[in-house]
Amino acid sequence: MNRGGELLGEGNYGCVFHPPIRCDNEKRRRSGVGKVVQRLEDALDEIKIGKKLFKIDPKGKFTNPMMSTCTIKKKNITQKDEEKIICGATSTLNNNTSYKQIIYKYKGVDLSVSESIQVKHFYNLALGLKLFQENNLCHRDIKEENILDLGKRYVFIDFGLSCKLDEVYSMEDSSWLLHPYIYYPPEFKIYAMMNDLLELDDEYLNNTEELVDDIFQQVEDSGYFDQYAQYKADLKDVGVYKNRRGDIYNAIHTIVNDTIGTNMSSANMKKYYKKLAMKADVFSLGIVMFLMTANNEELSLNEK
């Protein structure tokens, strides 16, 4: 007999159940959706973010509100008759191991599996980004899987990579910024590559033209432009992608020259990167909107 909720999904850090897994020392399950997080450190980070989001969006207009947390036991997420672990993230631990469960208000489905796309609902997401920026917050991981379709509106979920706007460009984070990810703006790659090149000798660093060319070549070699190849025709139709030496190419060159080709003070450089950080989520949401609507034959031209 399954003593846990229905498994809705499983990621790198844990699993999501509906209804939530029964909390330890409680007879009834709580309402909502339960997220069981494998590592306590990750759970505490998510709880901290959840509390902040609840303060800025208590009614859940743009996010899925965190309602409560509790402790659960591994034995409560097994199927007794088959002794099969429902949540693979917990499969190596014993039945008495405790986990943190974070309970969210809404169930819904994410956009990657949603049966229909409502363009008007993206306006609500844009308002959500405005709210985040007003509260110095960057989501940093906007994609279809992290947008929840509630029927009447879309909301953002999974803020595990979120941070303050002035922390988006961080030396500690430079490695994951190199990820060849279509939702990440080109600035992420440039910043990470700049950090790598800081290890070089001063004579090379003082040669601005050579440094700019090297960084740009690395961005090009990373296949960033090629990520858009399969969408080239659609992008060209909406004026986003003119050609290989078009808008994207020139935009990257501009950013490299702005950050390296001028002698900015540390204070001004910090302001510049915060300004770029404010565009990161907007870029990601724009890519989601394009991918979800460009080839959707059910949408009218006006809706697109």
Question: Where are each of the predicted segments found?
Answer:
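C-lobe/activation-segment region of protein kinase-like
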Residues: 155, 159-297
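Conserved C-terminal C-lobe helix
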Residues: 303-304
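Catalytic-loop of the protein kinase fold
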Residues: 133-150
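Conserved hydrophobic alpha-helix
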Residues: 125-132
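Conserved N-terminal boundary motif of the eukaryotic protein kinase catalytic domain
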Residues: 1-7
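ATP-binding glycine-rich loop module of kinase domains
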Residues: 10-83
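Conserved structural core of kinase catalytic domains
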Residues: 61-118
